[in-house]
Amino acid sequence: MKCDMHVHTIHSGMCTIPGMSRFCRESYNHPEALYESLKSQGMDLVTVTDHDSIDAVEALRSRPDFFLSEEVTCHLPGGTEIHVGVYDLNDRQHIEIQRRASDFLSLHAYLNEQELLYSANHIFSGLTGRRSAEDFRWFENAFPAIEARNGCMLERSNRAAADFTRRTGKVPIGGSDAHAMKSVGSCWTEVKDARDKQEFLAGVRLGLGEARGASGSFWKLTRDVLWIGCQMIRERPATLPMIFLSPAAPVITLVNYILEVRFVNKWTPRVLPPLCDGQLIAEPVVEEVAA
């Protein structure tokens, strides 16, 4: 069975880019259209991981192959921001998760108490800001799963995440992280021989899942940014004059590409140092962090 375990809809809130948060959404994917797109691409199960929201559930709750998830924004004890994927939760759990989101240790305790599956997402990306060496110790010791393949991250970022996942013995998660419809289903998690949602999620927990699909790129991100801009204008015609800014989109995404390359090049040798023959060492290289 296959499932894109990281995907966004119109319920992911407003864009976090300065100056755009008042009129541009993070995503313009409508839940029903998202569902149909994922099914047409061969996904056996469907979930939605909106930012700190489960509002998409109202449109999809009746679907037997749907399960509820979310992407929680929180801060590690050192102050750095991370995104945590939480899978197969219910409405009550969502409320408590959001109540605890400002306190990572409290959130971590609750996720374990409820026996929820959760992952640290896009850990070799500067998407959420600065990173510290301590963060990677938390990723090793406080998370059962790591997002090993993300359809919006560069291939080198995904390779580093997959290597970290293998070294630390974590459960691999794969998802498109699609904010634009054309990227939906580009990455997924696959559990062979699973026959239903319960068997799929049990297989993921046991580490039987595989993170598969295509990584992101400069061109893919540029396409998605332009698509989101078009949807913004369609929803808010008053923003039409901003269409003259569209030639700047490749410049913005090029800057993002350069920053992402610098980010992964900085942290990969620190967290995943190679041996003399170029092969990555198998055992964890990160110190233990007390819970």
Where are the regions that the model predicts?
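Short, hinge-like loop/turn segments at secondary-structure boundaries
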Residues: 64-66, 84-87, 136-139, 189-193
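A basic- and aromatic-enriched beta-loop-alpha substructure that forms the phosphate/nucleotide-
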Residues: 80-94
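Domain-core and long-helix interface of multi-subunit machines
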Residues: 3-22, 91-186, 214-222, 253, ...
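A hydrophobic membrane-anchoring feature enriched in long, contiguous, low-charge segments
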Residues: 229, 233-265, 269
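A short acidic, glycine/proline-enriched capping/turn motif at secondary-structure boundaries
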Residues: 53-54, 72-75, 90-94, 125-126
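An N-terminally biased module of ancient metal coordination in phosphate/nucleic-acid-related enzymes
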Residues: 1-81, 141, 182, 270-291
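Short, charged, surface-exposed secondary-structure boundary motifs
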Residues: 75-84, 155-158, 183-185, 200-205
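A conserved mid-domain beta-alpha-beta active-site/ligand-binding segment of alpha/beta enzyme cores
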Residues: 194-246
